[in-house]
Amino acid sequence: MLVVVGGAFVAEVADGAGGGRGWKRGWFGEAVAKGAPEILARLGEAGPADGDLAFGLNTAFMGDGAVIEVAEGAAIERPIHMVWMHGGAPASASFSRSLVSVGAKASLTLIESFEGPDDLDYQVNTALDLS
């Protein structure tokens, strides 16, 4: 499980330090800050969302997100669960971008959930780039 609260990764509740057998994970903001060429190249690619206003808004304001890579031929047995939590006041909006790369003949189950208190207004604009 990967947990993000208020836009910040919470390492204390994550499964595994950097992934598991056949897969690895990192954080989008960290990869961009380091200038990771494969991440920056994917940001510049045209995608099916060209002209999509919600995707454009996500691109303009995107914050952190997960970067998950599954090795060629790997079969990840346990689901990877990304939990995005909102809490506290005032009302908020979040814009995240996650990149998932799945190698040839590899498989995984990816679950995303978005949670927050019933009495808090929050808006989520998330984009998942799967390749």
Task: Go through each PLM region and give its residues.
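Glycine-rich and polybasic anion-binding loops at the starts of cofactor/ligand-binding domains
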Residues: 1-131
